[in-house]
């Protein structure tokens, strides 16, 4: 399995942390948004980070990737089966991807 993206990207780091919690090894290939890497573009034609490849399966978006990994490698389960608990996990994931990342970006990157 190959994870493409910028090492400092919170979305790349989310997938890497998720895989580590599951005990999975990912090959990491560093790419930037303007990188013409054809393997990255095959996973992410719109250059959305991270890109992910597992054999012939290719996809981008950190939430889609962790959902795939949890379904393919169910133990340990990191996304609950219970509908209410699953909904809470999806909510926290979306909250982290939008609100927390936006606030964190200002803290780390908008420094004068």
Question: What positions do the PLM features span?
Answer:
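GST-like domain detector, emphasizing the conserved glutathione-binding G-site
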Residues: 1-112
């Amino acid at each position: 399995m190959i994870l493409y993206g910028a090492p400092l990207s919170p979305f790349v780091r989310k997938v890497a942390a998720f895989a580590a919690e599951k005990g999975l090894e990912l090959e990491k290939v560093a790419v930037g948004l303007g990188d013409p890497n054809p393997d990255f573009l095959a996973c992410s034609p719109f250059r959305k980070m991270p890109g992910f490849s597992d054999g012939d399966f290719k996809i981008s978006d950190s939430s889609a990737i962790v959902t795939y990994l949890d379904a393919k490698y169910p133990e340990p389960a990191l996304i609950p089966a219970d509908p209410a608990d699953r909904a809470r996990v999806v909510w926290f994931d979306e909250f982290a991807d939008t609100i927390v990342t936006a606030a964190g970006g200002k803290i780390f990157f908008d420094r004068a």
